[in-house]
Amino acid sequence: MEEDKYRTVNAIAEGLYKEKGSRFISFIYPVKSEEEIKDIVTGLKTKYYDARHHCYAYCLGANRERFRANDDGEPSSTAGKPILGQIISNDLSNVLIVVIRYFGGIKLGVSGLIQAYKEAAADAINHAEIVERTVDEVIHVRFTYVVMNDVMKVLKEAEPDILSRNFEMECEMTLSIRQKDMPRLRERLLKIESLSIEE
């Protein structure tokens, strides 16, 4: 896959795995920040307050630069790690998977737990719509009305997303474009007289 592309999920999806009376309810979320992850996990712990464990793993960044696995009281590496393994083996980024366990009275053992958390995470992934996204960069441009036609010509050819525009005293636009296309867009815009770019 290209460096500025990654795979993620389009929306929340749910999975379920049952083993020896224990139920493992899994959720996969598209996420962008650790703050968002914290809020989701806290919300699920509140909603499923009577569950014994709320284990999770996440990967953030197009190249999975930031990741974490949490066993939430299960034996070390029996829950978070197999969940994380499913995220990585499915080549996903910017996702959180939470698996909630309701204990059924029969211990599963280390290998049983690893298998259960792996299967629960896999089921959530199987129910999710996987999409490809690009890593985009955002810039803010300012220019005068005099060069409006030149700016619009560049934008028509480069096709960035116009996130906002303001044409009052002077013209301002916030633009978003795929990371690999940004140097060319920036170069072409900076050739326009009186135009300035802010990151």
What feature does the model see in each segment?
Residues 1-77, 164, 191:
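C-terminal regulatory domains involved in ligand/effector binding and gene-expression control
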Residues 27, 54-56, 94-97, 138, ...:
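Structural motif
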Residues 129-145, 175:
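Short glycine-/aliphatic-rich beta-strand segments at the starts of folded cytosolic domains
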Residues 142-160:
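Short amphipathic alpha-helix segments
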Residues 151-157, 184-193:
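Short amphipathic alpha-helices in soluble, non-transmembrane regions
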Residues 161-167, 192-199:
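Conserved short beta-strand edge segments in small beta-sheet-based binding/regulatory domains
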Residues 175, 181-184:
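Terminal, non-globular segments
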